[in-house]
A protein has these predicted regions:
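Extracytoplasmic/periplasmic membrane-proximal domains and adjacent transmembrane bundles
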Residues: 1-115, 125, 172, 442, ...
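Transmembrane alpha-helices and their membrane-interface boundaries in multi-pass membrane transporters
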Residues: 160-175, 196-216, 223-264, 384, ...
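Signature of alpha-helical transmembrane segments and their immediate interfacial
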Residues: 194-196, 264-314, 355
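Hydrophobic transmembrane alpha-helices and their membrane-interface caps
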Residues: 91, 118, 122-176, 234, ...
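Flexible hinge/switch segments at interdomain interfaces of large molecular machines
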Residues: 6, 47-54, 94-96, 250-260, ...
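Solvent-exposed, membrane-proximal periplasmic/extracellular interface segments of envelope transport
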Residues: 2-10, 335-424, 479-501
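Helix-loop junctions and hydrophobic alpha-helical segments within the transmembrane domains
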Residues: 95, 102, 106, 172, ...
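Transmembrane helices with small-residue packing motifs
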Residues: 144, 214-223, 259, 296-332, ...
């Protein structure tokens, strides 16, 4: 038989039956001298409300490698099965359902990709004929199979769209022209592939290397967008393989040889468009110095104009959610914070378009997205998740709640922020001040905040130490304390017993373990003035004495409730947000003023916020970007075995900024991280087209054709493929203009590619004639 002297209580009532000794050597029941109750914490540590009603939250995360949509469907099915077991009066409400959001986002994006593919196929059918269009369109759809459906990988597929069709266009164009000249299908396919295989491979490899900085970037931004590089790697290599294998085979099967009455090479390019372009190109080459001067002038203007382009880091999410963070004065009771947070929540629910509010008081929500930035636990903090019917409704609700907080609750310190897609912070501009003395750091922070307040475009101005809190401190009388045998620790324990309660045991209730607290009655704890009457045991007198006998009195002081350090150095952050969308203009104004502050010896300043995030992302790219560009340059040199041809190609690359600047300024877009990816795509397209064109010129010159004629004929032969590749890419990006995540990237590629096409067809041959000293005639 097992003996188990656990001493556990079977019920709360049993606690009251515990016998304790008294001064009269008698035993009394605990329930005779104390009230024993089971209750919740008097001051909660955290509270949840959904639409103003008390709630409990359950967060569920997915295991790695699982399909989030499939997991969501299984969870929804299980929740429906458990609906009948929910107690009466309770209901299950979804705050954020990531599987649904992912499914909607991917489905919407797939529709956009489908529209883009349809546009691409339509353009090819219009300009290259039914059979060739069906060939390339079929190959394009083949590339879509097997690609994992998520935002970054689908974006990578759209970025690669122009490159995917370009390889097939070049091969199909060459075969079509040769067969129209009367050449047999097999011979036309063999000759076309033989002449273009290495140029296309070189262009494809360089296009892939343009994105290697993303895949090799070691920072969090590289991790977030790393799949983009691998999708482009696989899709472009596959496009090259199919362009030199499947495309010739299908062309040979489906295309019919034609008869060219002129019998020469110029027969397929004798149309009006080709003739006019030949004349314009000949004029540009004859006036090549003027052409170069004009292009260089446009480049200088674009570099200057790029300074006026808005700068951003990551775009915002499409999900119709945003956050309202409500900060009370530091040290506020959580119940006061709850009252104000519920007041804001009630106001929000009365606004048109607001479907749901979810409020947490005392700390952050469970982390429900990768980029959610949870705040620390604080009784002065509350966060409200606001769900609207559409994303377009957010600015209207945002403005109204911001005005309400400023006018009706001016004592609060609110932060309103959107749900981001990529990395980011609460404050876009952060000035970090480092030093040893908290008082000096607060003074420096106030100076920095004063500079921010002086700018009308700044809002949400604060520091992360927040306000000093009021503290009641007993002044221990050491002489009296020694005489009575009462130490500082015993004094603190007596005060803690009276105010908070002292844990003396644990009560097990099924699976719950509840603390047993002993504390003074409520009437003794309700008034600060009663603290001096609290008894503390004196071993010298062998009796309890009032706290007033051990202290000289109480003093009210202010102290820093929050002190933060960075790299083991005291650090305070003065921060703000712009009233508009972009932080860069405001940052550029306040940065020199804050840096002009006189810092005492031992104090320093550094910058955080979007500036630091952007610098880290660019630094991560900066460590891997040179390697990628070096490999691109080496590939172009090895491809030609000479230096002048790669020199022509790389002299044209910086000129892509002309189209980028013009497009972003005209569309009032911002150059963000996705725009950077679009620019890399643009570089790959530009280099690839230039490689194929220069390779064609070299082949014609090597075949004995006079230099000027070789440049004209080769460039005219590339007119249709280059324009088709550009048109398919530009038109294919139109559906993405409505997606906030890809809009700036789309503008960058569309505008940049338009000018890059002009560069390829006019400036590259002009530069070729200049560097190789080929004169007209």
């Amino acid at each position: 038989v097992r003996v188990s002297p656990t001493g556990e209580f079977a019920s709360v009532e049993e606690i009251g039956d515990v016998l304790i000794g008294s001064d009269e050597k008698r035993l009394v029941y605990l329930k005779d001298i104390a009230d024993i109750v089971r209750a919740y914490e008097e001051v909660p540590s955290k509270m949840y409300y959904v639409n103003g009603r008390p709630a409990l939250t359950l967060g569920i995360s997915m295991q790695s490698g699982e399909n989030v949509v499939a997991v969501g469907e299984r969870l929804s099915r299980r929740v429906r099965e458990l609906a009948d077991t929910v107690p009466v009066g309770m209901e299950l409400t979804q705050i954020y359902n990531q599987p649904v959001e992912v499914n909607n986002s991917v489905n919407g994006f797939v529709v956009s990709v489908g529209q883009a593919v349809a546009i691409v196929i339509g353009v090819l059918l219009l300009f290259m004929g039914l059979r060739v269009g069906l060939i390339i369109g079929t190959l394009l759809i083949m590339h879509l199979n097997g690609i994992e459906l998520q935002r970054i990988s689908l974006g990578a597929l759209v970025i690669a769209l122009g490159m995917l069709v370009d390889n097939a266009i070049v091969v199909a164009e060459g075969i079509l022209v040769r067969m129209q000249g009367g050449m047999r299908a097999a011979q036309a396919a063999s000759e076309t592939v033989g002449k273009t295989i290495w140029a296309l491979l070189g262009g494809t490899v360089i296009g892939i290397l343009a994105f290697s900085a993303i895949g090799l970037s070691p920072d969090s931004t590289g991790e977030f967008a790393g799949s983009l590089f691998y999708v482009i790697l696989y899709s472009l290599l596959l496009s090259w393989v199919t362009a030199i294998s499947t495309t010739p085979m299908l062309c040979a099967l489906l295309l019919k040889p034609g008869q060219n009455s002129e019998g020469g090479q110029r027969g397929p390019y004798a149309g009006v468009v080709f003739t006019v372009f030949r004349g314009l190109l000949a004029f540009a080459i004859r006036q090549r110095i003027l052409t170069v001067v004009v292009v260089v002038g446009l480049f200088v203007a674009a570099v200057v104009g790029f300074g006026s382009v808005k700068q951003a880091f990551f775009p915002e999410s499409n999900t119709p959610l945003f956050f309202v963070d409500v900060w009370e004065i530091e040290g506020s009771d959580i119940r006061t914070t709850r009252e104000d947070a519920l007041r804001v929540s009630e106001f929000l629910r009365g606004l048109p378009g607001v479907e749901q509010t979810t409020t947490v008081i005392g700390g952050p929500h469970e982390r429900f997205t990768l980029v959610y930035d949870p705040r620390e636990i604080s009784s002065a903090y509350a966060q409200i998740i606001v769900k609207t019917d559409t994303r377009e409704r957010i600015p209207e609700v945002w403005d109204k709640v911001e005005d309400y907080l400023q006018t009706q609750m001016p004592w609060t310190d609110p932060i309103i922020k959107s749900l981001r897609i990529g990395p980011g912070r609460d404050s876009k501009i952060e000035a970090r001040l480092h030093g040893p003395d908290p008082t000096v750091l607060r003074q420096l922070s106030e100076q920095a905040q004063a500079i921010m307040r002086a700018d009308p475009e700044a809002k949400d101005i604060r520091d992360d130490w927040r306000q000093p809190v009021k503290l009641v401190r007993p002044v221990y009388n050491e002489q009296v304390g020694r005489q009575l045998g009462i130490t500082r620790e015993e004094l603190a324990a007596a005060l803690r017993f009276a105010v908070e309660g002292t844990p003396v045991g644990r009560y097990r209730d099924g699976i719950r373990v509840l603390p047993i607290l002993v504390r003074a009655p409520d009437n003794e704890r309700a008034d600060v003035g009663n603290l001096q009457d609290i008894n503390v045991w004196s071993p010298v007198l062998d009796q309890a004495v009032p706290v007033a006998q051990v202290i000289s009195g109480f003093e009210t002081v202010f102290e820093n409730a929050v002190l933060r350090s960075r790299d083991r150095i005291r650090t305070i952050i003065a921060s703000c947000n712009p009233t508009g969308e972009l932080a860069t203009p405001l940052f550029n104004r306040v940065k020199p003023q804050i840096e002009a502050l006189e810092l005492p010896p031992g104090y320093s300043l550094s910058w955080g916020g979007e500036y630091e995030d952007s610098q880290k992302a660019q630094s991560g790219l900066g460590r891997s970007l040179p390697v990628g560009f070096l490999l691109m340059i080496l590939t172009s040199i090895l491809l030609f075995g000479k230096l002048r041809q790669p020199l022509i190609i790389w002299l044209t690359v910086p000129l892509a900024i002309v189209g980028i600047t013009a497009g972003l300024l005209a569309a009032n877009g911002a150059f963000d991280f996705m725009s950077l990816l679009g620019a890399l795509s643009l570089i790959g397209l530009l280099i690839k087209n230039a490689i194929v064109l220069i390779d064609e010129i070299d082949q014609q010159v090597a075949g004995g054709k006079e230099g000027f004629s070789a440049i004209l004929d080769a460039t005219v032969s590339r007119l249709r493929p280059v324009i088709l590749a550009a048109a398919t890419t530009i038109l294919g990006l139109i559906p993405l203009l409505s997606d906030v995540f890809f809009v700036n990237m789309s503008i960058t590629i569309m505008a940049g590619l338009g000018f890059a096409t002009l560069l390829t067809l006019v400036f590259v041959p002009t530069l070729y004639s200049l560097i190789f000293r080929i004169r007209p005639g």
